[in-house]
Amino acid sequence: TGQSLNRARMLQKLLFGIQMYAKPLDPQVPQLIRGLNILSILEIFMTVVVGQDTAKTRRTLTVGSKSIAYYSIPAAQAAGLGDFSRLPAALKVVLENMLRFEDGKTVSVDDIKAFAEWGAKGGKNPREIAYRPARVLMQDFTGVPAVVDLAAMRDGIVALGGDPEKINPLNPVDLVIDHSVMIDEFGTPRAFQMNVDREYERNMERYTFLKWGQSAFNNFRVVPPGTGICHQVNLEYLSQTVWTDQDQNGQEVAYPDTLVGTDSHTTMVKGAAVLGWGVGGIEAEAAMLGQPISMLIPEVVGFELTGAMMEGTTGTDLVLKVVEMLRARGVVGKFVEFYGTGLDNLPLADRATIANMAPEYGATCGFFPIDDETIRYLHATGRDEDRVALVEAYAKENGFWRDETYAPIYTDTLHLDMGTIVPAISGPKRPQDFVALTEGQNAFRREMEETFKRPMGKQIAVAGEEYTMESGKVVIASITSCTNTSNPYVMIGAGLVARKAAALGMDSKPWVKTSLAPGSQVVSAYLEAADLQKDLDAVGFNLVGYGCTTCIGNSGPLQPEISAAISEGDLVATAVLSGNRNFEGRISPDVRANYLASPPLVVAYALAGTLDINLATDVIGQDRDGNDVYLKDIWPTTQEVAEMVEATVTREAFLSKYADVFKGDEKWQAVDVTNQKTYDWPAGSTYVQNPPYFQGITMETHKITDLEDAKVMAILGDMITTDHISPAGSFKDTTPAGKYLTERQVSPREFNSYGSRRGNHEVMMRGTFANIRIKNEMLDGVEGGYTLGPDGSQMAIFDAAMAYQEQGTPLVIFGGEQYGAGSSRDWAAKGTALLGVKAVIAESFERIHRSNLVGMGVIPFEFTGGDTRKSLGLNGDETVSIRGLEGVKPLQEVPAEITMSDGSVKSITLKCRIDTEVEIDYIENGGVLHYVLRNLAKAA
């Protein structure tokens, strides 16, 4: 395996070298080399180390003139390992992984039999298994800290006497730079180039570091800035549905394409039957380095879709209803698989939108099995014809194909007739808050009264403008996010709404910041081919960049006069975006109410300029002659959209735009890096710093011990998201992070964002629990990252944590339900650990954040017996002790004592959410990366 790795790496470097040095000699050489395709070369030389195959399930599949090995689920059943015939396709992917890696150690024959027992028990058998995904996907906000960790691990293994080359990804890793572009300029033809220029100005340190990582690490590729969003690039290009590799014996093996990603919306690719989900960066790093992912065989909820979408509705409307239904059912930690006759009427683009929002409905994944539509999509998006043929043959041969006979066993089921879907939005704070479009105005007014407690109608003058600002006005309208820009039907729909509106002489309202940020360059190709980009430009939706932008909070500043009016009047300004998240404080610090909507509805709301309207029936504006215009006047028919998609979204467009996906523009090509094996950490960098995790590491581990006399850092409510814990957006010079940068002569204009500075632990520690909308229940009527320090005075959470660390006092945090919901960002756990928090006690945890806490050595606990922070009457001046941790077992209940300020003691029982045996090892090592590092050092 090592020899193959080295050969692949040498050839990769050789090709890059030829590209670089041959250019002055012969301009044709770089193009010839690019034609060799690095991915194909790495697939030739990379190996998958398969197991011993005790049950002899390996078979050969012939596709065309080529024979390829695979691990047969029917053969496993014939060998007497159990009945697997009615397992859901999503679970069969995991089963195949067990067959391929069965080695008698990490994967046993009993692990394989457990899948048959799952079916016999009606879809339940939570056995711990070791799962190995084929590859890893990253974006730059989470990818930079991951590469920082890998670079630090190289330093760490050198300190332990090991070889730095031991720290190398064993599986393919793709990092797509998509999270850094911000919308500084909008509504003009120059917006795209100006935003790109500012992106490079802000992020050159980070980009240099990532390019060093690409040269220093095996199997690590970077998709440069300005290319697209990682999940859309993954869906349209990187994913293969069926992957192939050579095994250690040199034989080619086919198996399901699988991955984990350092972004929670990695789930999107399950629309194309690729099993993938989000993990924290620390878990992804462990997977890269060969550590299997420890998981329980999940429950699988079947979601039956029937019927077809009605005229006037979109895939976005469907997914918002699905999110509402699944959140109400409760599917955290479960797989969801979609089935039913309705799939015959559901394009893969709509499936991908539904799969994308799995984190919003709480599931580990939302999976769509392989069928005729999958094959059509793979061909349409430019996949190699031989690969498309392999996908179909493999799926039919190995039991992954969905047809009219597909009838799996599910743990639970739901049903939705797609003919009942109506146009909708979701908001103002949660993706599951579904609102039918006809009820939008009433719902907003109700939120104003009950949630925001603000009156309607208060008007504030805007300096230098003829209009006024008032609550409900839309100040941001953004066509953004892979969730919807990957879907040609809604993007063409938005363009047609713009065309009809522009033809009538309409425009977006002047107070609306409009933007179009597609997830891939293919979108621009078909919008240009359809001649729709000029219509979008005409109503303000100019291209601002290829990246996540508004969806992750990179919406950029509002016009200062508008921002001032909102602040002066304490108004509830609104944003409408085609994204997947609308958590408070996420989109813009000036916006309190955020609504998710389809791209055509985003355009319509920009034209109307307010949420205080029944968009379905009210007048949204006037044409050039003063005549009233309604939504129905500018809404395209389903047939109009379908015909234009058919005419303009072509295989040739995908082949063209992805031909040079790793090349980058001239700015990227000009980034110069060294070829050192270890990173030369720049002392003055405010973007990349050597983290403290591995400094001073030894081979010694420590047993888990009881927690004694911990103080309370924060008491938080329900649905505390990772955005609350570790915000990604901008910050001011008055914050601890802002003060840190100011002290280092960084001007506020150059602060960039928290997300862009995740390679610097000093900034990120100061940004932990620093969301401007977080509410610590220890303080009355205070928003933001504050708590009570050791002396009882109010101070920033970072300052209090440092004061407690000086005293040697451990800290705990109390939370409510769904603690850690939202993004997969591992800094929500890293920051928690670096602040000195030893335990988080909540009513329930979201899957990824719980895992991340364990991965950083912080123990999650859940209340039992109906106890909550409220029922216990906690106010933050208590002292907490948790006993019974020595020799603790996974999911064990342990006693805890809470000593109140008056000296009285409340004894409660907590459930330890260390879920598996290997997680015990992680905690004893101080975290998963310490565990991996010590094991690699031992093997050196």
Give residue ranges: language-model regions.
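N-terminal amphipathic, basic-rich helices that act as targeting or association modules
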Residues: 48-198, 346-353, 360-372, 376-379, ...
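Long, structured ligand/cofactor-binding scaffold of large enzymes
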Residues: 102-306, 317-320, 423-426, 445-541, ...
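Terminal amphipathic helices with adjacent charged low-complexity linkers/tails
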Residues: 132, 157-202, 345-453, 617-676, ...
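Mobile "lid/hinge" segments at catalytic clefts and subdomain interfaces of large enzymes
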Residues: 250-388, 498, 502-510, 542-550, ...
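Extracellular/luminal Protease-associated
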Residues: 339-346, 580, 802, 806-846
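Long, charge-dense accessory insertions within large macromolecular proteins
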Residues: 599, 652-798
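Acidic, glycine-rich flexible loop/linker segments
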Residues: 623-638, 850-922
